Amino acid sequence: MTSANCGSGDHADQLVPQLVDRLAIRELVDAYAYCADRRDAAGQMALFTEDTDFLVYMDSRDPSPTQHLRGRGALAPVFDELNTYIATMHFNGQSTAVLDGDHASGVTYCLAHHVKVDGSERSLMIAAIRYLDTFVKRNGTWFFSQRKLMVDWTETRPLVTG
């Protein structure tokens, strides 16, 4: 059987770079969550382009963002805000990525758990988040060029340890 009969491998030659890019984008998304939970604001900021846009929608139904930050340096206060919690855990769920050369767009679902202490009371705030992302690959590395943090709902409840 010749290679013409089995396929020339062209499909695989096209598929492998796409798989590599998709994996790199997923690792970027997961690195953002990891840095958030480890309180590594500098590491989190390094995942963004210098000219990034970061928009926060505390109510995803509202067309106007609650916050709009421009530039990597502007992100520090938002990421430092996580220090008001004694612990966080971001669980990334399903995600999509649409590749277009060195650009991509995608959506990632996340359940973000935030533990807070107020005196002797502990509370857990869970936020259902959708990230609407635009990515760019520079010098072989993927970055966020825009990230929209869309809060679909939150729940806050006492946290009881047993």
For each predicted feature, which ranges?
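Charge-dense, low-complexity intrinsically disordered segments
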Residues: 15, 19, 65-69, 122
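Alpha-helical elements of Rossmann-like donor-binding domains used by nucleotide-donor carbohydrate transfer enzymes
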Residues: 31, 74-77, 130
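A solvent-exposed, acidic/Ser-Thr-rich amphipathic alpha-helical stretch
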Residues: 41-111
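Short, low-complexity N-terminal intrinsically disordered segments enriched in polar/charged residues
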Residues: 1-50
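Aromatic-acidic/polar surface patches that form glycan- and anion
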Residues: 21, 25, 37, 68, ...
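A beta-strand edge to alpha-helix "cap/lid" segment located at domain peripheries
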Residues: 2-13, 84-162
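Generic signal for short, ordered secondary-structure residues
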Residues: 11, 22-23, 54, 76, ...
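Short secondary-structure boundary micro-motifs
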Residues: 16-19, 51, 79-82, 117-120
